[in-house]
Amino acid sequence: MAKYLIRARIEIDGVVEKHDIIGAIFGQTEGLFGNEFDLRVLQDKGRIGRIQVNTKTQGSKTTGEILIPSNLDRVETALLAALIETVDKVGPYDASISIVDIVDLRMEKIKKIMERTVEILRRWGKEKTPDVKELIKSIQEYLKVPEPVSYGPEELPAGPDVDKAEEIIIVEGRADVINLLRYGYTNIIALGGARRVPDTIKKLAELKKTTLFVDGDHGGDLIMKEVLRNAKIDYIARAPPGREVEELSSREIEEALKKKIEIFQYLEEQVKQGNKEAQLLIQIQRRLHKLPEEVVKPPEKVAKEITETLSLPVKLIEDIKSLYGTLEAIFYSSQWDQVKRIPVRDLVSEIQASEPEKIHAIVFDGIITQRLIDAVVEKRVKILIGARLGKITFKTPELTILTFNELA
C-alpha cells in the first residue's frame, strides 16, 4: 500500500493520448535531480507506483487528471509533486500541470476504519458499546513517535530495545535519541551529556556490538576520543561534516550508518594521517576487546636520548623517602617545585582534571598501571615515578617511567 497519492490536473493545447502525457512526464523530469530521483528508478525500486492518467478532449484541447501513488516520505513526495509541475510540453503542444491535492492514504484508511468501527458499535447496541474516545486515543498513541526511556542508574536517554538488541548505537544526547526514534531506530542510548563515560555504557559495550555515532564537528571528535579511551567500540559512524546527528534526515542517518568504519581500521587511518593519540587509542581498544596486546617499544635512539638528558634534583630522593608507606603522590612543575600532594586514590581523577602540560612529573607511593600511564600521556606528563611497576602494554617514548628502586 502506498503512503500518499498525488492528484494533479493537466491542460494541453492540443489533442494527445494518455501515453503521450506519461512519456512527457518521464522525459522532461529525467536527470533533474540525478539518477537517484529518476522516476523510472523510483518505480523499479517500488518507491512510486504506476502513473495513471484520465483524459477528455474538448475541441482542440485535452484536459485530465494525473494520479501518482508514492511510498516516499513527506518531503520527498512534495518534491516529486513540484517536479512534475515543471512539465510544460506534451508533444508539440503547450501544457500545464498543477497539483490539486496530496492525499495521505494511511489517514484515509484509518478514517474508513474509524467510520466502520462506529458503524459496528452502533449495530451492537448501547449495552456493548465501548468508549470510542478511548479507541481513538489508543490509535493516536500507536501512531506517536516513541518517547525515550530512562536506562540504568544514570537514567540515560535510550530507545526501548537496548536490552534485547544484539547491537546498539551510542549517541551524545537526548535530542539525538529522539531523532533516531523518529525514524525507527530503537536500539540507541545516549551518553547523557556526562563529562565521563557512564558505567552503564561501559557495561553494555562489553556485552554487545557497538556503533559510536557522533556529530561531524570538533565536538564530535572530542566525544569520540573520550569514549574510545573508556569503552569498547566496534564501529565509528559520523554525521556529514558540520552537521549534528539530531538534525539529520532519515536518509542521511541511513547513509551515515551504512558508511560506518570498523574501529581498528578507523584508528589505523588516523595514525597514517599523523594523529599521535590514535596509536594509544588502538592499544586501549585492543585491551577492551581482550585482544593480544601489541607491546610498542620506543625507538632505541629516542630512549637513549631520554636517558642521557634526564636530570633529577637531589631533593627528589628525600621526597621519595618521605612518601614510603604514605600512599600519597606529589605533582611537580617543570622547575621541580611541588605543586600538589594528594592521596593515591585520587591520582587518576586529579590528572584527568588538570590542564595538558601543567604537570611535569609525578612521584607516588603506589603501582604504575596501564590506566595511570594512559591518563598521564593524555596530559603530556614527562616523568612518572612509582614504588613498583605493574603490567604495562604500551607507553610513548615521550614518557619516562622509573621506580623507587632504580633511584635508591
Swiss-Prot record:
Classification via HAMAP family: DNA_primase_DnaG_arc
Organism: Desulfurococcus amylolyticus (strain DSM 18924 / JCM 16383 / VKM B-2413 / 1221n) (Desulfurococcus kamchatkensis)
Gene: dnaG
Annotated residues for binding of Mg(2+) 2: 215, 217
InterPro entries for this protein: DnaG_primase, Primase_DnaG_arc, TOPRIM_DnaG/twinkle, TOPRIM_dom
Protein family (similarity comment): Belongs to the archaeal DnaG primase family.
One of the record's GO cellular component terms: primosome complex
GO terms of biological process kind: DNA replication, synthesis of primer
Lineage: Archaea, Thermoproteota, Thermoprotei, Desulfurococcales, Desulfurococcaceae
Protein name per UniProt: DNA primase DnaG
Catalytic activity: ssDNA + n NTP = ssDNA/pppN(pN)n-1 hybrid + (n-1) diphosphate
Cofactor: binding details: Binds two Mg(2+) per subunit.
Pfam families with a match to the protein in the record: Toprim
Residues annotated as binding Mg(2+) 1: 172, 215
Enzyme class: transferase
Protein's UniProt keywords contain Metal-binding: yes
Keyword Transferase in annotation: yes
Keywords, in A-Z order: DNA replication, DNA-directed RNA polymerase, Exosome, Magnesium, Metal-binding, Nucleotidyltransferase, Primosome, Transcription, Transferase
